[in-house]
Amino acid sequence: MDTRLSGYTILIVDDDPDILESMELAMRAEGATTAVAEDGTEAVQESERVNPDAVILDMMLPKRSGFLVLEELTKTDSPPVVIMVTANEGKRHMAYAQSLGVSEYLYKPVSLDRLINRVSTLLEERANQTHE
């Protein structure tokens, strides 16, 4: 069985329970350990608790926006790979996310296969950089 994400912990943050569940099932099917959060405040708390390798982050969240969460995540000593997923196609939002250090910016709806491929590729690239 193809388990490209074995050994990795992935935090999935989205306020839509259906999206959250489908992303979590897809990541687990690839061997990842997962944690979930439904709002920005919970996302920061979960990130501190599980120290994820990657975070899949919705931009529009209750309590604390995805941008504020991204800012917190990139301040850590070993920041995770962060993939922001959003239905908002504004170029300013993408530019702002990039200025904060987002690893990838994807528009909803995003296929689970594409999401898994991007997470896997970004984690592999990071692993290769640390071993050089």
Task: Describe each PLM feature range.
Residues M1-T9, D113-E132:
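Non-catalytic signal-transmission and effector/linker regions of two-component phosphorelay proteins
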Residues L20, P62, G90:
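The feature encodes the CheY-like receiver
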Residues D39-E42, S65-L68:
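Acidic catalytic/metal-coordinating carboxylates
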Residues L68, E89-E104, N117:
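Alpha4 helix (beta4-alpha4-beta5 surface) of REC/receiver domains from two-component response regulators
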Residues K108:
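A Lys-centered signature of the CheY-like receiver
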